[in-house]
Amino acid sequence: MTKKTQVGLIFGGNSSEYEVSITSAGNIYKAIDKDKFDVHPIWITNSGYVASEADSYKVLEEPGYMVEKNDKTANLSNLIELASRPELDVLFPIVHGNLGEDGVLQGLFRLIDKPFVGVDVLAAAVTMDKEFTKILAQRAGVPVAKWVSIKRYEYEDAKNQKLSYDWVSGQLGTSNLFVKPSNQGSSVGITHVTDDSNYAEALAEAFKYDDKVLVEEGIVGTEVETAVLGNDHPVVSGVGQIINADNTWYSYENKYSTESTTTLQIPAQIPAETAEKVQENALKIYQITECSGMARVDSMLRESDGEVIFNELNALPGFTNISMYPKLFEEAGISYPDLITRLIRLAEERYAHKKTILHKHD
């Protein structure tokens, strides 16, 4: 009998995307092939407490479950101890947001010498920052929405011209703007701005979540997403379409609320040559940011000329019931359990390759 792979499933975290992580982890736990894998959950509560394995199992079954003891003492050592157990063969982090998908956890996994699912340290750090990702996308020849970057020190300078809606909209050539934290996911902290009335409020909201805020031109058109899977030779899924109700956008509420007015359409109802361009751009961005394992790439099809405009790359896409990433590969013939298996095997392959690289001179 083949020995089953022991998987440490790490989820939760002190993040604005905590609930998304809990839901994603629960779905992975239910869908994983139990004939191939044993799951050892590691739950980080929303206050940063690393729970016991028994409590971690319980919250997967009851997402609203809370631990009675919530002492953060020696928390890092608790996480290291749980994640570095000899019996664990591979780690599967599904911690969204700050400290989870920005390279911090990935660096810890490298230090404790464990294979892990998803992108490595560099790609995690780079793709968490929307501005750096856009700069690299431009370098790869992929069109992006125009933007203005505002650092906190600029925001705190009352005389800075970037605090003027008229100046920024003039720079971007449109009154249709999105104000967003540069390092956040799930549309947290994003505001759609179309005039001066809520620009200051939008900046204040975004700066709650980051020290750098982007003001982007709003692209009028069709929102599409595609999924990428693999290491050195990645494959790209078909294209899915986000259909928003009139006068709405793909906000946090529309992504996760039961009262969402947004629907997902797979495959997207777009011309074949446009879908191919979306996939081609996604692959370019995946490779120039040195992603491995997985990523979801979001784009806009500009209504005026049909050009494919890169929006964002999510290197740790959600695995909720309504998440586009697993649905796109399901449409491509890769089931949810098989997708999880492939992600784990990709982590093992990358780890084995890393072991062949010399880190000191003989």
From Swiss-Prot:
It catalyses: 2 D-alanine + ATP = D-alanyl-D-alanine + ADP + phosphate + H(+). Its main location: cytoplasm. Pfam families: Dala_Dala_lig_C (PF07478), Dala_Dala_lig_N (PF01820). Pathway: Cell wall biogenesis; peptidoglycan biosynthesis. ATP binds at residues 170-225. InterPro entries: ATP-grasp (IPR011761), ATP_grasp_subdomain_1 (IPR013815), D-Ala_lig_Van_CS (IPR000291), D_ala_D_ala (IPR005905), Dala_Dala_lig_C (IPR011095), Dala_Dala_lig_N (IPR011127), PreATP-grasp_dom_sf (IPR016185). Mg(2+) 2 binds at E312, N314. Its EC number is 6.3.2.4. GO terms for biological process: cell wall organization; peptidoglycan biosynthetic process; regulation of cell shape. Mg(2+) 1 binds at D298, E312. Binds 2 magnesium or manganese ions per subunit. It is found in: Cytoplasm. Residues 134-345 form the ATP-grasp domain. GO terms for molecular function: ATP binding; D-alanine-D-alanine ligase activity; metal ion binding. Cell wall formation. Belongs to the D-alanine--D-alanine ligase family. PANTHER family: D-ALANINE--D-ALANINE LIGASE, D-ALANINE--D-ALANINE LIGASE A. This is D-alanine--D-alanine ligase. It comes from Lactobacillus delbrueckii subsp. bulgaricus (strain ATCC BAA-365 / Lb-18).
